[in-house]
């Protein structure tokens, strides 16, 4: 493996969907990046109809794949307003709300910085700047570095 890229959902709060962040040190000459994106699991990976959020991660992965020599018939189109799109509350919606009823309101917040080469996508900071109500606890330790 010469390249390894991992898109992570910053706003997924189901502990059962905790990301498998890569923590093993990378070998020499292997490019690794794990990037956090706005949204819950299916917002980042795709799964909701008419949702612009998955295109953020897909465009990033396409860019990385193209840089590694892969070709594409078309580029992913990312709307400038995509980072401000609705984030689905997968915690409350999952299993028609049964998940939240069973687990209670014990939302899980991801931990940033324990993995190999973790980065935060610019779309997260765009949303942070535009939406004063968007302050993921996961980023509390790194947000001051970004401003």
Locate predicted features:
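Active-site- or binding-pocket-proximal scaffold segments within functional domains
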Residues: 1-147
